[in-house]
Regions:
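Conserved PLP-binding active-site segment in aminotransferase class I/II-type PLP enzymes
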Residues: 1-81, 85, 129, 148, ...
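Conserved PLP-anchoring active-site segment centered on the Schiff-base-forming lysine
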Residues: 76-134
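Aromatic/hydrophobic pocket-lining residues that form π-stacking "cages" and hydrophobic walls in ligand
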Residues: 100, 161, 225
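Active-site phosphate-binding strand-loop segment of PLP-dependent enzymes
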Residues: 119-208, 213-222
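Active-site C-terminal subdomain of aminotransferase-like
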Residues: 220-233
């Protein structure tokens, strides 16, 4: 007799029994805020900022958040804000969704894929450092950025990756699209690097059906990203 196989969904969106989602959709139409700006978006950014800035031990981080059209856009603008451009190289995790690497090529740069370690399935720190040294020897310059990923809510080796990044002066754009809500040593994933990427696609921990956000280290970085995202308005 064949066994019955039950589908286990990686992530399934849940609508509240109180229909709160419909309330806010109606509110947007009633107030004519149907553009991707306005009080609901501002409030969402503020709540995200409050969440990512609070460590589990009660201490605070100084973070800013920009809501964007997609997680891919967050990777794109994070790399752009790091100065990535034609002729540059960016170290990126090989085991990931293509949105982690496509923005690198959008900017005319070249991805340098780094394989994963067995424990976390995420970027192997030792292979990362070897790649950085190798690219410096072959091209005369270091990679312009590093993009580690938090797959399936699992943190990459944040301590070691950040140690290597700081050693060589390379900014980190942390792809926490699948890691929102998870913490490493009490700190929210996406808050370790210069920028952190969030996604609110339909298969993520919280969803707006589509959309994303970029966690920034300071108001200046947020202003720069907002300038890119809103056509310099």
């Amino acid at each position: 007799m064949d066994k019955e196989h039950k589908m286990i969904y990686l992530c399934l969106a849940h609508m509240s029994e109180e229909c709160m989602e419909q309330k806010y959709v109606k509110e947007a139409f009633d107030t004519n805020w149907v553009v991707p700006l306005g009080p609901n978006v501002n409030g969402f950014e503020d709540e995200l900022k409050a969440f990512v800035s609070k460590n589990s031990d009660g201490t605070d981080l100084q973070k800013e958040v920009v809501a964007l059209s997609a997680g891919t856009a967050a990777v794109h603008l994070g790399l752009l804000a790091c100065g990535v451009g034609p002729g540059d190289e960016v170290c990126v995790q090989s085991f990931t969704f293509c949105a982690s690497s496509h923005p690198i090529t959008y900017l005319g740069a070249t991805p340098v894929f780094i394989d994963s370690e067995a424990d976390s399935w995420n970027m192997d720190p030792e292979l990362l450092e070897k790649a950085i040294i190798d690219r410096k020897e072959k091209t005369g310059k270091y990679p312009k950025a590093i993009v580690p990923v938090d797959l399936y809510g699992m943190p990459y080796n944040c301590d070691r990756i950040m140690e290597i990044a700081n050693k060589y002066g390379i900014p980190v754009v942390e792809d926490a699209a699948e890691g929102f809500g998870s913490r490493y040593k009490g700190q929210v994933l996406g808050t370790f690097g210069k920028f952190g990427v969030l996604s609110f696609n339909g298969n993520k921990m919280i969803t707006t059906s589509g959309g994303g956000a970029l966690i920034c280290n300071d108001a200046e970085s947020k202003t720069q990203v907002m300038w890119y995202a809103t056509q310099a308005r």
